[in-house]
Amino acid sequence: MMLSMAACGNGAEEKETENSAGTEAQAAGGESTLVYGSNDYTRINPAMDEHGEINILIFSGLTSHDGENQVAPGLAKSWDYDEDTLTYTFHLEENVKWHDGEPFTADDVKFTIEAIMDPDNGSENAPNYEDVTAIDVIDDHTISFTLSAPNVAFLDYMTMAILPKHLLEGEDMQESDFFRHPIGTGPYKLDSWDAGQAITLVKNEDYFKGAPNIDKIIFKIVPDDNAKAIQMQSGELDLALLTPKDAKTFADQDGYTCYDMKTSDYRGILYNFNNDYWTANKDIIPAINYAIDRQAIIDAVLLGQGMTAYGPLQRNIYNNENVEHYDYDPEKSKEILEA
């Protein structure tokens, strides 16, 4: 099943909740600060393995996603695709600076993607770029990628955070201290990191798309989902990503706003094909699949905040609804077992 989240805030299908009262009180003091209930981070290394909300605040990709989850410009203001040569050419924004003041160029892009592709670096993102056969820097603000085959998801993959070559060249891409003191091109800069307690970001006045409205964002480390809901209620948090059950508590409360949003979070019951049992009894697998009421699980566990999945990919613009799948059909399951 694909999980839908909700974000709720004090004044998400997982819900994000916003607490308007807390933020307004801080804004009245002159500096606007948002306190977000976050899971913990051991490092901030989007190119190798980390997935977190903090990445898109500190870093930028060549592309981004808009409010409808469609591909939009990022560090690349535009791009072209040559169907004959399977080549994407990206035209980069000019006058973009890293948080340390150094200029961003196409060399940073080439460095980042090649670092991800390098098997010695052990990046879990490497499979996204296995079709790339050549990366050519045309000039400081133009770069091309040639593929071995068409890849409909390539522009999505280019949302990958770009890293600064001048700070990471020659560094260990897994162990470098950079990933505890990251420098990006994003709308926020790292201000402080109190391990296990909070990560504080301040707005980047030189952000190439314009300085953000909120002056400071505090990622308060609250790993427990229940604790996030409690701290939303007490006003200790302004924003949190909550489970559907917890988000429902805030949906109708004055002073709170909940935002439903789709995620790529995936949950499934998988077969262990290393076990000889499934090799010997593979004929019963369809029967098991037909016997599982996925929608009932979504309704009971996620309060309906999710959708049935046919595989690990999102049912979005790339989805093929005609792919073979097993809808809930207990009678068909019984027929297979009795055959």
Per-segment meaning from a language model:
Residues 80, 84, 126-168:
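Surface-exposed binding/hinge segments that line
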Residues 66, 159-211, 216, 331-335:
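Gly/Pro-rich hinge or "lid" segments in bacterial periplasmic/extracellular proteins
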Residues 204-250:
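Ligand-site clamp/hinge motif
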Residues 280-339:
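Append "and occasionally in soluble cytosolic enzymes with long acidic Gly/Pro-rich linkers
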Residues 1-33, 70-73, 133-134, 330:
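Short, low-complexity disordered leader/linker segments with a strong preference
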